[in-house]
Amino acid sequence: FMKKKMKIKGLKQNSFKKYIMLYFIFKNKLTLGLFVFGLLFMSCQNPQNNYKYTEIDAPEEIAERAYRFAELYAESETEYDLGGQDPARTAIKIDCSGLIIMCYKYALVDTKYILLQSDMTANYMYKNASTIIPRADLKKGNLLFMGEETSDTVSHIAIFEKEENGIIYFIDSTQKDINGDGINDINGVTRRKYNNNDKRFKAFGKMRLMY
């Protein structure tokens, strides 16, 4: 399948087990090639302080790949969990920013790029790890910064799919009691949509990467 030899001796045992589980979850949705690339995931470490990195906006192909992983999370019955950043496996729990981080981490496998930080809140990504863009420039996999209608504070983040007939479609991880009966009608990673003028949208952006 691949002529290039891959060195995985440095991969920790626990990390290797994660990729075995990832393969069985995604085996009907991803190619074997992406699974093999996943073995390189742990090689993407946090940047060293003595090395100078170059920052760029995430290329479109990286953003689209991140969205594809968001789709897989949505199809894997992922539950919402504040602070969660579980890799894709059984009994997955993840919060809104954790979803974005993990999708981009998977999307960056076998590339020269890494995230600016390995753990970020929605507000941190808005202020420090993204380039703000007009709504008209949104592409699949870009970031939707969101919050309460009555506040300007970014407290939530989603990944953009498309805008069609004035409606913005996206994937996010959240808990919501829509009917007001005390039961969460939404609990986890789902596909959702809002009007493009909804006040819960605070800004739109591209993920910043470095290499």
Model-assigned labels for residue ranges:
Residues 137-138:
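Short, well-ordered loop/turn sites that connect or cap secondary structure elements
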Residues 141-143:
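Structural motif
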Residues 46-115:
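N-terminal capping segments
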Residues 125-134:
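Short alpha-helix capping/helix-loop boundary micro-motifs
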Residues 12-32:
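Bacterial N-terminal signal peptides that target proteins for export
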Residues 49-56, 132, 154-211:
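Aromatic- and glycine-rich peptidoglycan recognition patches
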Residues 42-43:
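C-terminal motif of bacterial Sec signal peptides marking the signal peptidase cleavage site
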